[in-house]
Amino acid sequence: DFLRKQVQMNKEYIEQLHSKNSSKRTNGDKVFRLWDVVILNPPAFAKSQKELKHALRSYKDLNLHAMKLVVDGGFLITSCSSRHVGFDQFLNMLEAAAADAGKLLRMVNYRGAGEDYPHLIGVNIGNELKFAVFEVRSRKSAASVLQQRKKEEAYK
């Protein structure tokens, strides 16, 4: 309700899509629609250390499909709430997903748990929340942008 009121006040167009199956929005590599912003808030796939490998694969697949749904220059907002997935593993998984999707990611913001969520030293509690905002570019367009910047630098 809050979101709807904000959208109406700002006269913005926002469409929400809730899906437990990201393949409903793609048919293999064919994407049916591109979005300016895609937000992922998946459940904790790794409830135990034993489930970590499968969980990382699931997070990778989900993020890979999401990256394909973002317009070039749009944003992917993604998160992970599994305490068994560390920050480095989270970023490595996203890097692998981006490579497989043919995308480049530019991290705009990263957050962990808020101040009201305690981090207990010596116990793996409190560091499970990972949240990141990325600008998503196709590898081809990113190369073009870099080439243009080099030309602009040469004229200075």
Predicted features, each with a name:
Residues L3-V7, D36-I39, L56, K60-M67, ...:
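Generic hydrophobic alpha-helical scaffold/packing signal
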Residues S19-T26, W35-H65:
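Mobile active-site "lid"/loop adjacent to the S-adenosyl-L-methionine
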Residues V70-D72:
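Helix-to-beta-strand junctions that scaffold the AdoMet/dcAdoMet cofactor pocket
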